[in-house]
From Swiss-Prot:
Enzyme class: lyase
Pathway stated in the Swiss-Prot or TrEMBL entry: Porphyrin-containing compound metabolism; protoheme biosynthesis; protoheme from protoporphyrin-IX: step 1/1
Keyword Nucleotidyltransferase (UniProt): no
Protein name as catalogued: Ferrochelatase
Catalysed reactions, as listed in the record: heme b + 2 H(+) = protoporphyrin IX + Fe(2+)
Organism: Rhodopseudomonas palustris (strain BisB5)
Positions bound to Fe cation: 215, 296
Family listed: Belongs to the ferrochelatase family.
Function comment: Catalyzes the ferrous insertion into protoporphyrin IX.
Taxonomic superkingdom: Bacteria
EC number: 4.98.1.1
Keyword Endoplasmic reticulum carried by entry: no
Pfam families: Ferrochelatase
Keywords: Cytoplasm, Heme biosynthesis, Iron, Lyase, Metal-binding, Porphyrin biosynthesis
Length: 345
């Protein structure tokens, strides 16, 4: 008797998912809530990143967990509450970054294989969750777009670090590209100039000068080779040239210092205080290093520094909105994305 034994071959491979290209906009991050608990969770993740605080030794860990996370969250929660989008129960940074992604996607509807998403380096939606979601949607190629015009290890590099951590755990990794800084791109400088001029046209006063305030960083980071300061200078030089302003009319300063180390100078708050004491009565401040309005622009500049200016003799103060999801702002991001997608489209 002949026995026929069925031969089972390997299971058929799953049907291929249509190949797509993912575009992921990434900004710094935000708490999930504006209460002390939410801010503490956010600050713990942010301040535990060795790209942000490079000396993560025992002294720092003791200070972070013993002092900072027990005192700073309550103070910062009050600041977040001043600017919180209560309708959506989220920070303005989250609202704006979502809008940027949606408007960028709308401008790319003729590219049906492009999938646009957004993430935060700290907080939610996390880089991990959005990269995994893009891969699940069939994105075999991924363009990560750090929304920082000027490069720094504490911003752009940590986005790359986290993206690669996520990829390291994937069996099927997408091909990855990261957009470069765009601190001197013509589209970016033109958009800044247009935004400044449009805002000034709405004011009932003419500023005597404009302060260009960038997020600060420890001077030691620059001495180790971080190009951030030189790129901030290059941005302001290009903006001065574009607007026909000299160094006395468009000043460069650095804000948001933290801790006791020396940070990049001149400091924004000290400069604004001195300008008022020296007789400047009408002032405008622009924040070219921020792609989106956030705590540092809406609270620190538009409220805290406005109060400093008025308290020391100033009379008129205006914080110029960031590019956000304006037409010019989206055009800057779109040009950057399309340039870096060459060869993939």
């Amino acid at each position: 008797m002949t026995v026929i034994v069925p031969i089972h071959g390997p299971a058929p491979a799953p049907a291929p998912v249509p190949e797509r290209v993912g575009v992921l906009l990434v900004n710094l991050g935000t708490p999930d809530s504006c209460d002390t608990k939410g801010v503490r969770v956010y600050l713990r993740e942010f301040l535990s990143d060795p790209r942000v605080i490079e000396n993560q030794g025992l002294f720092w860990k003791l200070a972070l967990n013993g002092i900072i996370l027990n005192t700073r969250p309550a103070r910062k929660a009050k600041d977040y509450q001043k600017i919180w989008n209560h309708e959506k129960n989220e920070s303005p940074l989250k609202t704006i970054t979502r809008a940027q992604a949606e408007k960028l996607a709308a401008s790319l509807t003729d590219r049906s294989h492009l999938v646009v998403d957004w993430a935060m380096r700290y907080g939610n939606p996390s880089l991990r969750s959005r990269i995994e979601a893009l891969v699940a949607r069939g994105c075999s190629r991924l363009l990560v777009v750090p929304l920082y015009p000027q490069y720094s290890a504490a911003t752009s590099a940590t986005v790359c670090d986290q993206a690669f951590r996520v990829l390291r755990e994937l069996r099927a990794q997408p091909t990855l590209r990261v957009t470069p800084p765009y601190y001197r791109d013509d589209a970016y400088i033109d958009a800044l100039a247009n935004s400044i001029n449009a805002h000034l046209a709405t004011l009932s006063f003419e500023p005597e000068m404009i302060v260009a305030s960038f997020h600060g960083m420890p001077q030691a980071y620059i001495e180790k080779g971080d190009p951030y300061q030189s790129q901030c200078v290059a941005t302001v030089d290009a903006l001065r040239e574009r607007m026909g302003l000299d160094e006395k009319k468009l000043l460069l300063t650095f804000q948001s210092r933290f801790g006791f180390d020396q940070w990049l100078q001149p400091y924004t708050d000290k400069t604004i205080e001195k300008l008022a004491k020296d007789g400047v009565r009408k002032l405008a401040v622009v924040m070219p290093g921020f792609a989106s309005d956030c705590l540092e622009t809406l609270e620190e500049i538009a409220q805290e520094n406005a109060e400093i200016f008025m308290h020391n003799g100033g009379e008129e103060f205006s914080a110029i909105p960031c590019l956000n999801d304006s037409d010019d702002g989206i055009a800057v991001i779109r040009q950057l994305v399309m340039r870096e997608l060459q060869g993939w489209l």
